[in-house]
Amino acid sequence: MHKDEDQRLLGPAPLPNDPDRSLRPQVLDDFIGQEAARANLKIFIEAAKTRQEALDHVLFVGPPGLGKTTLSQIMAKELGVNFRSTSGPVIAKAGDLAALLTNLEERDVLFIDEIHRLNPAIEEILYPAMEDYQLDLIIGEGPAARSVKIDLAKFTLVAATTRLGLLTTPLRDRFGIPIRLNFYTIEELEYIVQRNARLFAVKISDDGAHEIARRARGTPRIAGRLLRRVCDFALVKQAKQIDRKIADEALSRLEVDHLGLDPLDRRYLLLIAETFLGGPVGIETIAAALSEPRDAIEDIVEPYLLQQGFIQRTARGRILTEKAWSHLGLAAPASTSIQKRTQLSDAQDNVSLQTTLWDGEDD
């Protein structure tokens, strides 16, 4: 991920000074939002405890910052077992994975974040570990090489990914409990902001909490980060409490608008609007023009813009919606509807194709 993207105020990736570690709920009943996922996890955990067996392997899917790591830690606590954590890119060789797995005790939870970035060779070793609780390792090289099987404790693998499509089918099929996490509602985020403010011993009004929540991009981690920054403004201004005026002033100075868009989001929208007349435009072109990696655009910027209805993905590329033009305060082109622009683009392609065919006949 791009360095600048990593440090965005509204980036969902955790920052070193984020307050959310100390604010994380410790049990499922304290976890706010994700009602369906939480209810199902309660049942699965209770069933595993009743049977005195390891919980089936769990796969969390969803944008960053929605609570995948927190839910994994809560699961381990609810099960009364140890929790080990790592991430896909960190497991560089077979020995790294073997060291992790052989140190697990019965029913322990192993959390692997960004599992879609796991080395394919490591993934092959993970298959028998997940299915048969065995490690198949090759010791030595050449004619002297031999296969060694190591029995493992029955553990639970909890994995998280932001890009389900990058997981191979064999790996995806080995997870007995797939769970999708969605963006939070403003009401849920408002409750989280008020809860965090109490833990910070900071007074906040309902409209102040609402103002922070509606700019938090549906992400609890970002809500906590924005609350901390607004607290800084309130402290310096010697405000008795955080109200809507204080929150609006602080967040406006941080260039976070009323829908939670930051400068990178606006650059993205303006690029499509001004340079490409609203689209369609391909993701590679957008990434190159913004000097950002394609992965950062697809994983960090676009999910929220899609969820808010600012853009649409088509077979021909990204297209701005009426809502995006309105938010930017720009007049849309005459043929502004997505259908009209797509049809126009297809018609242009057909003309180009026919011209090429006629040129070929002339030759």
Curated annotation (Swiss-Prot):
This is Holliday junction branch migration complex subunit RuvB. Its main location: cytoplasm. Belongs to the RuvB family. Residues 185-255 are annotated as: Small ATPAse domain (RuvB-S). InterPro entries: AAA+_ATPase, AAA_lid_4, DNA_helicase_Holl-junc_RuvB, P-loop_NTPase, RuvB-like_N, RuvB_C, WH-like_DNA-bd_sf, WH_DNA-bd_sf. It is an enzyme of class 3 (hydrolase). It catalyses: ATP + H2O = ADP + phosphate + H(+). Keywords: ATP-binding, Cytoplasm, DNA damage, DNA recombination, DNA repair, DNA-binding, Hydrolase, Nucleotide-binding. One of its GO terms (biological process) is DNA recombination. ATP binds at residues 23-24, 65, 68-70, 131-133, 174, 184, 221. Its EC number is 3.6.4.-. HAMAP family: DNA_HJ_migration_RuvB. Has 3 domains, the large (RuvB-L) and small ATPase (RuvB-S) domains and the C-terminal head (RuvB-H) domain. The head domain binds DNA, while the ATPase domains jointly bind ATP, ADP or are empty depending on the state of the subunit in the translocation cycle. During a single DNA translocation step the structure of each domain remains the same, but their relative positions change. Residues 1-184 are annotated as: Large ATPase domain (RuvB-L). The RuvA-RuvB-RuvC complex processes Holliday junction (HJ) DNA during genetic recombination and DNA repair, while the RuvA-RuvB complex plays an important role in the rescue of blocked DNA replication forks via replication fork reversal (RFR). RuvA specifically binds to HJ cruciform DNA, conferring on it an open structure. The RuvB hexamer acts as an ATP-dependent pump, pulling dsDNA into and through the RuvAB complex. RuvB forms 2 homohexamers on either side of HJ DNA bound by 1 or 2 RuvA tetramers; 4 subunits per hexamer contact DNA at a time. Residues 1-23 are annotated as: Disordered. One of its GO terms (molecular function) is four-way junction helicase activity. Homohexamer. Forms an RuvA(8)-RuvB(12)-Holliday junction (HJ) complex. HJ DNA is sandwiched between 2 RuvA tetramers; dsDNA enters through RuvA and exits via RuvB. An RuvB hexamer assembles on each DNA strand where it exits the tetramer. Each RuvB hexamer is contacted by two RuvA subunits (via domain III) on 2 adjacent RuvB subunits; this complex drives branch migration. In the full resolvosome a probable DNA-RuvA(4)-RuvB(12)-RuvC(2) complex forms which resolves the HJ. DNA binds at residues 294, 313, 318. It is found in: Cytoplasm. Mg(2+) binds at residue 69. One of its GO terms (cellular component) is cytoplasm. SMART domains: AAA. It comes from the Bacteria. Residues 258-363 are annotated as: Head domain (RuvB-H).
